[in-house]
Regions:
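Hydrophobic core
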Residues: 10, 14-18
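Positively charged n-region of N-terminal signal peptides that target proteins for export
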Residues: 1-10
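Short helix-initiation/N-cap motifs at beta->coil->alpha
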Residues: 73-75, 131-144, 271-283
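Alpha-helical, coiled-coil/dimerization segments enriched in small aliphatic residues
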Residues: 135, 247-277
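Extracytoplasmic substrate-binding proteins
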Residues: 67-70, 77-79, 166-246, 326-389, ...
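N-terminal low-complexity, Pro/Thr/Ser-rich intrinsically disordered segments
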Residues: 41-76, 80-81
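A short, structured surface patch at a secondary-structure boundary
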Residues: 90, 94-149, 153-161, 263-266
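Bacterial lipoprotein signal-peptidase II cleavage site
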Residues: 18-31
């Protein structure tokens, strides 16, 4: 009996040991699962590291604003997109300035550049839809084309005119797109480039670069003009039109370059016109003005004027001191008065007062084309541009 009991106890102990060993084996192979199915307290403890990685709401960086308030040169406060990459110019002046700072952002153009102009300008301008002009005698803004291009803002640049505030407000309400004005005549051009650099996405450096060029130009002109005494002052007439009887009189925006470099504008009239064609004068008035130098715009009678009896008696013609204003890609003095005037300041100062504006205009022309339009002028192209002015004067 005792032996049977002892045998049963031994069997029981062996069986218990086997059961314990299986249980241990199962725990080892199932360890990953049991770690995930632990008690609620253990689950919360395991989840705590994920919670601590989350940034509390109050510490998150504020979202970038979608719009910004901008006060334009007319004092109008307009809400603009914070990230501007699609712009439409209001006309020719705006086209020229915007093409210098951000051609890739332009979605329209006032008018397609001619083939000769496109040779110097960014290639994308040729394919842009034409929207016409917002202001002037040729105002013909095409709203349908403008809206189809989907700009974020319409930008008007140039000089202040009449009741612009009312006109821009009305247009903005009509099209549902922000419309702003930035003053950009010669005295305000550097500021205009800096303003555009701040508004347009990624253009701060380019805006400052162009503004620095304007500052350099105006400072140079102011310093040199101050050296010109009254007895040195040259009387200059700047003509327009095929017959040369359109004139940009003293005080006209179209004649800003003449004022800046220190010449005397020979044409003085009571009712000054700021239009591209200027004031129309008669031959009698022309004889009375009798300037020392005459500047002809392209497409005029420049080539034949020396053989024209109506003109040959004038001092400027008889002495050979008449010149043609370079006009590629745009007239360097005006037409329209925009950033092309920067070229005009360097050119006219050197043409009239080479001993004061003392630099190589051929080299300067290449530098300015590179800066403004990214175009590398060849020496042959420089000769073509300056042949009827700087190079002609140097040969006299």
């Amino acid at each position: 009996m005792n032996r049977r009991i002892i045998a049963l106890l031994i069997a029981f102990i062996m069986l218990f040991g086997l059961m314990t060993g299986c249980a241990s084996g199962k725990q080892e192979t199932a360890a990953p699962e049991t770690a995930q199915t632990e008690s609620p307290a253990a689950e919360e403890a395991a989840a705590e590291p994920e919670q601590t990685e989350e940034v509390p709401a109050e510490e998150e960086a504020p979202a970038e604003p979608e719009t910004v308030s901008f006060t334009d040169s007319l004092g109008r406060t307009v809400e603009l997109p914070a990230d501007i990459t699609r712009i439409a110019p209001s006309g020719a002046v705006a086209t020229m300035i915007l093409a210098a700072i951000a051609p890739e952002c332009m979605v329209t153009i006032n008018a397609a550049p001619s083939e000769s102009r496109m040779a110097f300008l960014p290639a994308n301008l040729a394919a842009l839809p034409e929207t016409g002009q917002m202001y002037g005698s040729k105002a013909n803004l095409n709203l349908e084309t403008l809206l189809a291009a989907d700009p974020q803002v319409v930008i008007d640049l140039g000089d202040k005119k009449g009741d612009m505030t009312e006109g821009l407000d009305a247009l903005q309400e009509q099209i549902g797109i922000p419309v702003i004005f930035i003053e950009a005549d010669l005295p305000h051009m550097a500021e205009a480039f800096r303003t555009l650099g701040g508004l347009l996405s990624g253009k701060a450096d380019r805006g400052e670069f162009l503004a620095a060029l304007v500052d350099r130009t105006t400072t140079m002109a102011e310093e040199n003009a101050a050296k010109i005494t009254d007895d040195m002052r040259v009387r200059v007439m700047y003509t327009t039109g095929e017959d040369g009887l359109g004139t940009n009189a003293a005080g006209s925006m179209q004649a800003q370059v003449l004022d800046m470099v220190g010449v005397e504008n020979a044409v003085v009239v009571e009712d000054v016109s700021n239009k591209g064609g200027g004031n129309i004068i008669s031959l009698e008035q022309l004889y009375n003005f009798d300037p020392d130098v005459i500047l002809f715009s392209d497409g005029s009678i420049y080539d034949t004027v020396a053989d024209d009896s109506a003109w040959s008696q004038l001092t400027a013609i008889s002495t050979g001191k008449y010149y043609e204003v370079p006009s590629s890609p745009y007239n360097w003095l005006s037409g329209p008065p925009s950033m092309n005037m920067i070229l005009g300041v360097w050119w006219l100062g050197n043409l009239i007062y080479p001993e004061i504006y003392d630099y190589d205009m051929e080299t300067m022309t290449q530098e300015l084309y590179k800066t403004l339009w990214g175009y590398e002028l060849s020496s042959e192209e420089v000769t073509a541009l300056l042949g009827n002015s700087t190079l002609k004067a140097a040969a006299q």
